[in-house]
Swiss-Prot record:
<dbReference type="GO" id="GO:0022627">
    <property type="term" value="C:cytosolic small ribosomal subunit"/>
</dbReference>
<keyword id="KW-0689">Ribosomal protein</keyword>
<keyword id="KW-0687">Ribonucleoprotein</keyword>
<protein>
    <recommendedName>
        <fullName>Small ribosomal subunit protein uS2</fullName>
    </recommendedName>
</protein>
<dbReference type="Pfam" id="PF00318">
    <property type="entry name" value="Ribosomal_S2"/>
</dbReference>
<dbReference type="InterPro" id="IPR023591">
    <property type="entry name" value="Ribosomal_uS2_flav_dom_sf"/>
</dbReference>
<dbReference type="GO" id="GO:0003735">
    <property type="term" value="F:structural constituent of ribosome"/>
</dbReference>
<dbReference type="InterPro" id="IPR018130">
    <property type="entry name" value="Ribosomal_uS2_CS"/>
</dbReference>
<dbReference type="InterPro" id="IPR005706">
    <property type="entry name" value="Ribosomal_uS2_bac/mit/plastid"/>
</dbReference>
<dbReference type="InterPro" id="IPR001865">
    <property type="entry name" value="Ribosomal_uS2"/>
</dbReference>
<comment type="similarity">
    <text>Belongs to the universal ribosomal protein uS2 family.</text>
</comment>
<dbReference type="GO" id="GO:0006412">
    <property type="term" value="P:translation"/>
</dbReference>
Length: 249
């Protein structure tokens, strides 16, 4: 099935009510039907391919992409696809300063990892009942807030965002730090601050699943390319080494 057909079936082309539109999205709008803007899927396909190409190249260089989707329709889909391709994700609330104040976030990650060790080695069982309850409450809170980024050792190399209106702070923080943003932008939002725009429906679960799967697939393809490149380098290196030995003999 062609990508455009998939997008059509997932309802990617359905924008928001015309009265809520953002004029900056005009280049990506085909028209309107029953007071709802219809997104030009030819534009979406081209922009989506640009975005996945960027992600693939970034992943091939060993880069990390932070998946961001905290609204109800996106949470589970974003977390599942990020985990599938081994990337960090934020599926609960975006904490202000998650990027711009990463030093503080790192100390929370350190605490979470220490707590996980306590659970793994059984030392948590030595706590009193009250301490145990407080411990579990803190662990749950940390897991919900930063569980998806606990293996992120530094700032990400890019952000993939579902719904820029919902994640204005995340996009603004990425802009401040010069981190490229790949984002799904619906007809009611501004594409400002987004480096790789995917014009499309940001409410439908089927549409969100399509975007998240596509970005995750691009990451996996890039990673595979990276591994193949390393294998080729090693093989070439071995051949050169053998030739040097032959010359010496």
């Amino acid at each position: 099935m062609s990508l455009m057909r998939e997008m059509l079936e997932a309802g990617v082309h359905f924008g928001h009510q015309t009265r809520y539109w953002n004029p900056k999205m005009a280049p990506y709008i085909f028209g309107h039907r029953n007071k709802i803007h219809i997104i030009n899927l030819e534009q979406t396909v081209a922009k989506y391919q640009e975005a996945t190409k960027f992600v693939k190249q970034l992943a091939a260089r060993g880069g990390n992409i932070l998946f961001v989707g905290t609204k109800r329709a996106a949470r589970e889909l974003v977390a599942t696809e990020a985990e599938r391709c081994g990337m960090p994700f934020v599926d609960a609330r975006w904490l202000g300063g998650m990027l711009t104040n990463f030093k503080t976030v790192k100390s929370s990650i350190k605490r979470l990892k220490e707590m996980e060790v306590m659970v793994a080695d059984g030392s948590v069982e030595r706590l009193t009942k009250k301490e145990g309850l407080l411990f579990q409450r803190e662990l749950d809170k940390l897991n919900k807030a930063i569980g998806g980024i606990k293996d992120m050792n530094g700032l990400p190399d890019a952000l993939f965002v579902i719904d820029v209106g919902y994640h204005k702070i995340a996009v603004a923080e990425a802009r401040t730090l010069g981190i490229p943003v790949v984002a799904v932008v619906d007809t009611n939002h501004s594409p400002d601050g987004v480096d790789y725009i995917i014009p499309g429906n940001d409410d439908s679960a089927r549409a969100i699943a399509l975007y998240a799967k596509g970005i995750a697939d691009a990451v996996l393809e890039g990673r595979e390319q990276n591994l193949n490149g390393l294998v080729e380098e090693i093989v070439e290196g071995e051949e050169e080494f053998v030739e040097v030995q032959d010359g010496q003999a």
